[in-house]
Amino acid sequence: RRYERRALEEAIQIYPEAVIATPGGLVSDAATFNLLLAHCTTVWLRASPGDHMQRVAAQGDVRPMAASREAMDDLKRILAGRAAFYSKAEIELDTSVKPLEATFADLRAKVRGALRLPL
């Protein structure tokens, strides 16, 4: 987690207007998560546990399913445990059961609105 924080600090300093995709577990380190909240426009791309699992499998990563028969229950617990942290994001967008194009259009509109940019 220390390396994640250092990478985030560096990214914020060097690229103040960049889009930074962080790992979901970043919220487990309060200092790193607070750094993100203080310096960035934050977006929670929320998805159902089923969609999370499908997306991981679609990337060819079957480890979550192979490691445990209770993988879905584990994923639900992880997401529920992080939800209070994720909800601190300025923007929240549910990406479940949405085509990519519609999700992107919604995301673009929400971010431009938050940054007070013309749509």
Q: What positions do the PLM features span?
A:
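Generic detection of well-ordered alpha-helical segments
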Residues: 2-9, 13, 50, 73, ...
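ATP-dependent small-molecule kinase phosphotransfer cores
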Residues: 1-37, 85
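Short glycine-rich anion-binding loops that position phosphate/pyrophosphate groups of nucleotides
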Residues: 24-26, 48-50, 98
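Conserved acidic residues
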Residues: 17, 40, 90
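A glycine- and Lys/Arg-enriched "phosphate-lid" helix/loop adjacent to the NTP-binding pocket
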Residues: 38-83
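Short amphipathic alpha-helical segments
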Residues: 31-34, 54-58, 105-106
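NTP-dependent small-molecule kinase module
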Residues: 80-119
